[in-house]
């Protein structure tokens, strides 16, 4: 499975890239600047393979300009701030094609327009994920996920104590992304229903940021009380 991470040089994108590369997935770091993407990929290879004494393999972890990164990927993960989401989707749209899955991790925080990171903006389409779906070519499945994962926890060794809520109108695509989420140690994946439910999941992120600011922590979300099969473990 090849995964292009758009915004892969940022904290969230690089953290997801690190975890999936450790799980043996082929990861392509996307950036506006190909050189920056290549440098980020080199650092990631050193983290993943250096400590274990395994030679770096460019074919497993590589870097490319965002549009180029999308062209050969089965799954495209968008990890850019809300203010950059629409522009980025318009940029990569020509490189997206039917059969791909676009995973949107965007949270419409008020900080994107100079407001507080503990508040969300209203999105005309209902959610950032629904806005992404509107800007995505026909035949590309849009899945909303990974909104509530702390970027800091992704970069720390050890399991991530957090559940990932996955929302999509395409059940098969959602199932694939839940399986991908489970490759991160400690993470459970929960079916969040249709894409419109992403609005609720996105709002939770602002609440978690508030917890983190007040407590100087890295809070996550756990869904309890469901039967074991609901967590896709």
Describe each region flagged by the PLM.
Residues 1-46, 183:
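NAD(P)+-binding Rossmann beta1-loop-alpha1 motif at the extreme N-terminus of oxidoreductases
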Residues 84, 106-109, 149-150, 170, ...:
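Glycine-rich beta-alpha junction loops
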Residues 115-125, 156-172:
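Short beta-strand and adjoining strand-loop segment in the mid-core
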Residues 63, 103-104, 141-145, 189-192:
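General beta-strand structural signal in soluble alpha/beta enzymes
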Residues 55-101, 108-115:
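Rossmann-like NAD(P)-binding element
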Residues 162-233:
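Active-site-lining helix/loop region of Rossmann-like oxidoreductase modules
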Residues 47-62, 138-141, 187:
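A short helix-to-beta-strand connector/capping loop
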Residues 122-146:
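Rossmann-fold dehydrogenase core element
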